Amino acid sequence: MSLLLDANVWLAAADRDDAFHDAARRLVHSERIEHAALDLTVYEVGNVATRRWRDPERARRLCLLVLTACRERLVRIGADLAEEAVRIADGEQITVYDAAYVAAARRDGHVLISGDLRDLVERGLALPPDAAEA
């Protein structure tokens, strides 16, 4: 099974206070899953760990985890994906950033997993970490 994990999932796996910590950790460390992520996910997790958590070493480890786990499935943002993300964002009234995850998952046949309940999960655009099988 190929799962595209958004930044919320990678961060939840590293944050014991996150409601999805246990489920996200199982997903991130599962060897039965083909992990995928957007290339921008690396920067987002690094930014949160460095700026919000004030932990550059944790940021470095998280960035490497995403890069290692998604080695062959790190989705690069190109013109076609950006165009589709804008179309989805306009239609769903979500950010283009969130829509990029949706567009990549649809295009490449991944199941999108997100901790963003309001904008992605409740709209049926993604599954929460605790609904996916590790």
What do these predicted ranges mean?
Residues 2, 75, 102-134:
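Acidic, PIN/NYN-like endoribonuclease modules and their adjacent C-terminal/linker elements
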Residues 11, 47, 103-106:
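A cross-family signal for key residues in well-ordered alpha-helices
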Residues 72-115:
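Active-site neighborhoods of divalent-metal-dependent phosphate/nucleic-acid chemistry enzymes
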